[in-house]
Amino acid sequence: MTDTLSRLAEVLESRKDAAADSSYVASLYHKGLNKILEKLGEESIETIIAAKDAAVSGDCSDVIYETADLWFHSMVMLAALGQHPQAVLDELDRRFGLSGHTEKAARTAE
């Protein structure tokens, strides 16, 4: 799984300096963080709607499709902020085995 994320991160990084008209990702970078966040918000809503539809229909294909879009645009956002998806994976690893209540209490105490 992480190989796919790493490969995608490399592509996203390579598009930062590309001409805006050379790719969709390059055009997002050139439009700036606000446009990237707008797309991320749109994808979040589309994922939620797909999940609600899947709960009724039992067909999760749109949920998978929309979640892929959500992850993709999340990675574009991270790259725009100079972050690699490994930082998110590291955070998930840190939380693994930690009760949600304990993790939340640790955040509140900081």
Swiss-Prot record:
Pathway: Amino-acid biosynthesis; L-histidine biosynthesis; L-histidine from 5-phospho-alpha-D-ribose 1-diphosphate: step 2/9. It is found in: Cytoplasm. CDD domains: NTP-PPase_HisIE_like (cd11534). Its EC number is 3.6.1.31. One of its GO terms (cellular component) is cytoplasm. Keywords: Amino-acid biosynthesis, ATP-binding, Cytoplasm, Histidine biosynthesis, Hydrolase, Nucleotide-binding. Pfam families: PRA-PH (PF01503). It catalyses: 1-(5-phospho-beta-D-ribosyl)-ATP + H2O = 1-(5-phospho-beta-D-ribosyl)-5'-AMP + diphosphate + H(+). GO terms for molecular function: ATP binding; phosphoribosyl-ATP diphosphatase activity. One of its GO terms (biological process) is L-histidine biosynthetic process. It is an enzyme of class 3 (hydrolase). NCBIfam families: histidine_hisI, PRK00400.1-3. Belongs to the PRA-PH family. This is Phosphoribosyl-ATP pyrophosphatase. It comes from Pseudomonas syringae pv. tomato (strain ATCC BAA-871 / DC3000).
